[in-house]
Regions:
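Conserved catalytic-core segment of nucleotide-activated headgroup transferases in glycan assembly
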Residues: 7-86, 154, 187
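Hydrophobic/aromatic beta-strand patches that form the interior of the parallel beta-sheet core
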Residues: 5, 27, 72, 93, ...
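Short, acidic/turn-prone active-site loops that include or flank metal/cofactor-
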Residues: 9-11, 97-101, 133-137
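A short, active-site helix/loop in glycosyltransferases that binds the activated sugar's phosphate group
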Residues: 1-2
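C-terminal alpha-helical cap of glycosyltransferases
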Residues: 181-198
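Short, surface-exposed amphipathic charged segments that create phosphate/polyanion-binding patches used
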Residues: 17-28, 108-114, 166-170
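Donor nucleotide-activated moiety binding/catalytic core segment of transferases
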Residues: 77-119, 123
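Catalytic binding pocket for nucleotide-activated donors in carbohydrate/polymer assembly enzymes
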Residues: 85-88, 116-181
Length: 198
């Protein structure tokens, strides 16, 4: 809904203040899996589930790094909470929620299966690339919605590599009509709340 984009979210005010940084990385943002999170909560040794969940993303990160791109992995805070050592040992730089805004404004593109991090990236000037290595049916709806506002859909990791190359070379750019215009989301939301108060 364009009205939501125009109003903004309070956290976007901070994101806006960071815009204009030099872009030097590709952010991979797989969505979290609540079943994996619950399993880790019950059994901290169930890190094999994390390995299975992140394997295609780590393979993509390795390929992009080999192609000369600085790659950063978004690690969902709920998963990091249960297995911090696993994420520290990845060999790929990983960020959680706290460092995410700085990473977004420095990223050329955000690659995601369906994480809201892709939305945040697109309003921060990143090109959105939708790729689901598990090919879940509901990702098609997510992909279609995001392609309608300028994201790139990718069916294979090779297509992700091609899209990243196009973005870094400047052949594909982020849609300008999605960029944050100001840091006034808090003020707008407060005004709307005051208007509707009884």
């Amino acid at each position: 809904d364009r009205e939501v984009w125009r109003t903004g979210f309070p956290r976007h005010d901070h994101l806006h203040s960071l815009l204009g940084r030099e872009r030097d990385s590709i952010l991979l943002a797989p969505t979290w899996d609540p079943e994996v999170s619950r399993a880790l909560e019950c059994d901290p040794d169930a890190v094999g589930l994390l390995s299975a969940l992140y394997r295609p993303w780590l393979e993509l990160a390795a390929g992009l790094t080999q192609a000369g791109h600085r790659t950063v992995l978004f690690a969902h805070p709920k998963l990091v909470l249960h297995a911090p050592e696993w994420f520290r040992a990845l060999g790929v730089p990983a960020v959680t929620g706290h460092d995410l805004p700085e990473t977004l404004v420095r990223s050329w593109a955000v690659v995601s299966d369906r994480s809201s991090v892709l939305d945040e990236g697109m309003i921060a000037g990143c090109v959105g690339i939708v790729w689901d290595p598990r090919g879940r049916p509901d990702t098609d709806r997510y992909r279609a919605r995001h392609e309608a506002i300028g994201a790139i859909g990718a069916d294979t990791s090779a297509q992700v590599h091609q899209a990243v190359g196009d973005v870094v070379a400047g052949r594909v750019t982020a849609p300008e009509d999605l960029l944050l215009l100001d840091a006034g989301a808090c003020a707008r939301l407060t005004a709307l709340l005051r208007r509707d108060m009884i």
